[in-house]
A protein has these predicted regions:
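Conserved catalytic neighborhood of penicillin-recognizing serine enzymes
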Residues: 1
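Active-site beta-strand/loop architecture of penicillin-binding DD-peptidases
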Residues: 4-97
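Acidic/histidine-enriched alpha-helical segments
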Residues: 28, 97-112
Length: 112
């Protein structure tokens, strides 16, 4: 892989969380560790949209990478909040118990 291409991708992922126009900027603007990330959505049947976010931190020397996907979750910046909270716990930044801020709902459907 050409290093120039890799650098362009990495800078794009940094701008997602650090530039005011970034799709996850609102979620990471006050986060004390630099994060690279990418929001996304995937169309599903019946006009449903799955949301996802992939992030890694610290940007300069990553220790952790996380992907969160929520079925029928809409757009990816909501999943960025989940990644931010997990990273906050990992780096010892959150003061509240993570269970108070996050929940998981298991949804299953049988296709006929």
């Amino acid at each position: 892989l050409n290093q120039n291409y890799l650098n362009a991708v990495l800078q794009g992922m940094k701008s997602v969380t650090s530039d005011t126009g970034g799709t996850a900027y609102v979620r990471f603007k006050d986060f004390n560790i630099s994060v690279g990330g990418k929001t996304g959505s995937a169309e599903a049947p019946n006009n449903q949209v799955h949301a996802w976010f992939v992030g890694f931190a610290p940007f300069e020397n990553p220790e952790i990478a996380i992907v969160v996907m929520v079925e029928n979750g809409g757009h990816g910046n909501y999943t960025a909040e989940v990644v931010r909270d997990i990273m906050g716990e990992y780096f010892g930044m959150n003061t509240q118990d993570i269970e108070e801020n996050m929940g998981a709902m298991i949804y299953t459907e049988t296709l006929q």
